[in-house]
């Protein structure tokens, strides 16, 4: 069971003021320790648990680590994008651009909602000015770490399923249902039934 390996604490974010605000709100619980952030609307399916891959890199570098995915150029405007220098599957991040307009970056590597962060992120968030819609963006604090060469990106060997939309949630349910021996036949039968109607 999870309880044997981790302490899970729910922290209420008083208003939707951005991912940076959510991370900053958790500061009293993370204290002076490194911690992981996993966005629940992104499910990563692959041979190696994504957070484990990030922790292995963190153990070697001691710095902040972010999971990355390569997306089509037309999709970069929807994500935080990283630029930098590649060393194998690791990117020494030099620049972070939050949702760049099309054509403003050559990079197609975006954050996928998995991070290992140092406690230093909290004071960076505290001094970050809110952006659009009054939201505090984690990417602004990550950009500061990148400017200090203290952020590593890792190209994850995983498929990302975005459950943030109704169609994305349906796709994730189908992909996961079809991948399990105990549910695959039932999911196929459901698809066939609704496909015929």
Predicted regions located by residue number:
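Catalytic-core segments of class I nucleotidyltransferases/pyrophosphorylases
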Residues: 36, 55-59, 86-189
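Conserved beta-loop-beta/alpha segment of the NTase-like Rossmann-fold superfamily
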Residues: 1-86, 119, 125-128
């Amino acid at each position: 069971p999870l309880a044997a390996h981790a302490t899970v604490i729910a922290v209420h974010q008083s208003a939707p003021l951005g991912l940076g605000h959510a991370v900053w709100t958790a500061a009293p619980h993370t204290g002076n320790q490194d911690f992981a952030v996993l966005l629940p609307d992104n499910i990563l399916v692959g041979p190696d648990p994504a957070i484990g891959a990030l922790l292995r890199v963190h153990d070697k570098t001691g710095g902040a680590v972010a999971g990355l995915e390569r997306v089509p150029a037309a999709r970069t405007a929807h994500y935080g994008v990283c630029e930098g220098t590649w060393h194998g599957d690791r990117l020494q991040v030099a620049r972070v651009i939050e949702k760049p307009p099309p054509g403003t970056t050559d990079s197609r590597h975006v954050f996928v909602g998995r991070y290992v962060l140092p406690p230093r992120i909290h004071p960076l968030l505290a001094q970050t000015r809110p952006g659009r819609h009054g939201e505090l963006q984690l990417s602004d604090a990550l950009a500061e770490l990148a400017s200090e060469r203290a952020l590593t990106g890792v190209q994850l060997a995983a498929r990302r399923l975005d459950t943030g939309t109704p169609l994305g949630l349906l796709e994730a349910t189908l992909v996961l249902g079809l991948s399990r021996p105990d549910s695959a036949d039932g999911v196929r039968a459901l698809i066939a039934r609704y496909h015929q109607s």
